[in-house]
């Protein structure tokens, strides 16, 4: 510790190399991974960058002990960068994506889980004013009912993505949030694992979402999204509630496209900055207006005024597709959880399957 304090003095007068060497030694030889990484300047750049991140984290109030322990041996994870470049939401067609996620087996399991936990789910839904079947739908798709939470180091994954220039600001914020999660003692460092992009727990919350939305529903003093399903479902429910979920409203519906439609003429004049998936939504129209264009619900909707009386945007289909999706306001809330139209449609369809079996 004496060495590191001396190094910080040198940093203030501009001798950056001393700082880098001392911090690297403290973090377990951080710079030594240069020989194991791919050729080029990136390992050295990453090591220097991590020194700056350490400084930022401590300035934000995270203890030096937490930061130093978290950064021991951290180096870029090429698996994370490869996964980032081939996300299924962007490389698969709607049909391929849905076939792999909204399967008969998953729908059956979702209905079983819903029935077994219906009383608890309805208590949670009532408290947060959301619709209970969606809790199971999110749980199913995010972690296969809690069974697949990921085995990537959260810190290493976020450091890798934060160092990458494409979305550096976003992932730097998530890295700081992850360090805060550790610093507050919510999970031990050796258990701090999850998805390749830094999502964690049975509901695959990003660290900032955990800090903002995680719930202690059973009152045991812990916000446990890793092994406590009551906390998992309540955290999802609170997230949806805080992102403008409208209880009792439809997410949308499957539709048949009977004839070609010039969707380019139906696009909004402008799109609110944020989720890029919204760029593929038309402006909202009534079901009557859509029907006049040859787009009709796959299932009759007129009996329910909460559905038939609303306006819906169309997720613009690929050329030649005869099945599409009209989506409402709750669809936007689903997109806030994961900004991908295919993902959001999967959530809606799976929730519909649970509801259909429960009626």
Where are these regions (language model features)?
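Substrate-binding clefts and substrate-entry loops adjacent to catalytic sites
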Residues: 99-112, 165, 169, 186, ...
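Bacterial N-terminal signal peptides
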Residues: 17-30
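Short, functionally critical alpha-helical segments immediately adjacent to catalytic or ligand/cofactor-binding
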Residues: 57, 66-76, 129-146, 178-181, ...
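Flexible, glycine-rich surface segments
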Residues: 189, 196-304
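Secretory-pathway/luminal and periplasmic proteins that interact with or process carbohydrate-rich
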Residues: 76-83, 143-153, 164-168, 184-190, ...
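C-terminal soluble interaction/assembly domains
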Residues: 261, 267-359
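An acidic, Gly/Ser/Thr/Pro-rich helix-cap/linker signature
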Residues: 37-125
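N-terminal secretory signal peptides that target proteins for export/translocation
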Residues: 1-15
């Amino acid at each position: 510790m004496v060495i590191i304090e001396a190094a910080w003095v040198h940093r203030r007068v501009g001798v950056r190399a001393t700082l880098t060497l001392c911090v690297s030694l403290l973090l377990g030889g951080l710079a030594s991974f240069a020989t194991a990484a791919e050729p080029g300047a990136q390992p050295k750049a990453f090591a220097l960058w991590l020194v700056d991140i350490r400084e930022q984290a401590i300035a934000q109030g995270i203890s030096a002990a937490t930061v130093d322990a978290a950064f021991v041996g951290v180096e870029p994870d090429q698996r994370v960068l490869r996964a980032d470049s081939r996300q299924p939401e962007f490389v698969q067609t709607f049909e391929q994506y849905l076939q792999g996620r909204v399967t008969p087996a998953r729908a059956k399991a979702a209905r079983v889980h819903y029935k077994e936990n219906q009383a608890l789910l309805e208590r949670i839904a009532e408290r947060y004013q959301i619709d209970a079947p969606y809790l199971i739908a999110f749980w199913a798709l995010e972690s296969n009912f809690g069974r697949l939470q990921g085995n990537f180091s959260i810190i290493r994954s976020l450091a890798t993505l934060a160092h990458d220039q494409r979305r550096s600001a976003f992932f730097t914020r998530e890295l700081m949030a992850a360090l805060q999660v550790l610093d507050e003692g919510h999970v031990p460092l050796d258990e701090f694992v999850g998805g390749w992009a830094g999502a964690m727990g049975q509901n695959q919350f990003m660290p900032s979402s955990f800090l903002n939305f995680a719930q202690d529903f059973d009152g045991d003093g812990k916000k446990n999204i890793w092994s406590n399903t009551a906390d998992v479902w309540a955290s999802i429910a609170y997230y949806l509630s805080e992102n403008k979920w409208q209880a009792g409203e439809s997410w949308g519906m499957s539709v048949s496209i009977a004839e070609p439609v010039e969707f380019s003429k139906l696009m909004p004049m402008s799109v609110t900055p944020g989720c890029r998936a919204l760029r593929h939504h038309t402006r909202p129209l009534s079901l009557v207006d859509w029907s006049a264009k040859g787009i009709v619900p796959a299932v009759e909707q007129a009996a329910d005024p909460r559905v038939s009386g609303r306006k819906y945007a169309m997720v613009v289909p690929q050329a030649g597709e005869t099945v599409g999706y009209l989506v409402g306001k709750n669809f936007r809330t689903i997109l806030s959880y994961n900004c991908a139209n295919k993902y959001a449609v999967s959530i809606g369809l799976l929730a519909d399957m649970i509801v259909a079996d429960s009626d």
